[in-house]
Amino acid sequence: MSLTKTERTIIVSMWAKISTQADTIGTETLERLFLSYPQTKTYFPHFDLHPGSAQLRAHGSKVVAAVGDAAKSIDNIGAALSKLSELHAYILRVDPVNFKLLSHCLLVTLAARFPADFTAEAHAAWDKFLSVVSSVLTEKYR
Amino acid sequence: MSNFTAEDKAAITSLWAKVNVEDAGGETLGRLLVVYPWTQRFFDSFGSLSSPSAIMGNPKVKAHGAKVLTSLGEAIKNLDDLKGTFGQLSELHCDKLHVDPENFRLLGNVLVTVLAIHHGKEFTPEVQASWQKMVAGVASALGSRYH
């Protein structure tokens, strides 16, 4: 599965808008994840997960920054996220099912904040893009 | 499986009261067919599904979407007995329509996204969590009589 030219254009142009709110988007995405899918909290026993916690904010920023890196190198996401891919495969070992859950929560956050931009076509492009990102992050699992 | 708290029920029913079932139905089904094109396999008789605009403007898609969401509206009145409410529809989807229950999960998540688009800030993480419970309950109920 690879992104068409049109899909790449949609992602890159929306990212320019999104990047100004990157930090709060990250925090909101994680809040949505932990509330809708409480089992995902099992990966963060060492975190204070209360809304507004500094750790949540920091981690949310990290996650969205990585999505941004993928968007900025959309022609070679594998190379851009290679280190992160190894981290997830050898250290974090987050079960692959969770990437879908996080992707969904990020989509919902974007839909809520950018309703006019989130057309059916944009929705499809983002779903596919996050699916590609997820594949890259799990490709070294076994 | 899904036990809805008083807060869940309040979040679900109050948001639902603001939903235009026809518009939301068409948009939800349309987006399912655009974002997950393989779901078009069930709709050969619907005419043109050749582009996002063709799909979103297709009158059969809109009509069927409205039908689906109307049914969901019935479920919202019976949150404590989703299995009972959807028993017959479950049999229909298995025996006559041959729909893989995974499609119910996909549709549920598309609905959640559509609600986020139309309700923005009001669709808080807490409200979303209640709705995720709701769509998961519906998906489970619709799959409950598969054999």
Curated annotation (Swiss-Prot), chain B:
InterPro entries: Globin (IPR000971), Globin-like_sf (IPR009050), Globin/Proto (IPR012292), Hemoglobin_b (IPR002337), Hemoglobin_oxygen_transport (IPR050056)
Modified residues (S-nitrosocysteine): C94
UniProt domain Globin: residue ranges: 3-147
GO BP terms: hydrogen peroxide catabolic process
Record PTM Phosphothreonine, positions in chain: T13
Modified sites of kind Phosphoserine: S45, S51, S53, S140, S144
Binding site for heme b: H64, H93
UniProt KW keywords: Acetylation, Heme, Iron, Metal-binding, Oxygen transport, Phosphoprotein, S-nitrosylation, Transport
Gene Ontology cellular component annotations, sorted alphabetically: blood microparticle; haptoglobin-hemoglobin complex; hemoglobin complex
Record SUPFAM superfamilies: Globin-like
CDD domains given in the database record: Hb-beta-like
TM ranges: none
Tissue specificity note: Red blood cells.
Leader sequence segment: none
A Pfam family of this chain: Globin
Modified residues (N6-acetyllysine): K60, K83
GO terms assigned for molecular function: haptoglobin binding; heme binding; hemoglobin alpha binding; metal ion binding; organic acid binding; oxygen binding; oxygen carrier activity; peroxidase activity
Record family assignment: Belongs to the globin family.
PANTHER family: HEMOGLOBIN FAMILY MEMBER (PTHR11442), HEMOGLOBIN SUBUNIT GAMMA-1 (PTHR11442:SF52)
Biological function: Gamma chains make up the fetal hemoglobin F, in combination with alpha chains.
Subunit structure of this chain's protein: Heterotetramer of two alpha chains and two gamma chains in fetal hemoglobin (Hb F).
Designated name of the protein: Hemoglobin subunit gamma-2
Species of origin: Sapajus apella
Organism lineage: Eukaryota, Metazoa, Chordata, Craniata, Vertebrata
Gene for this chain: HBG2
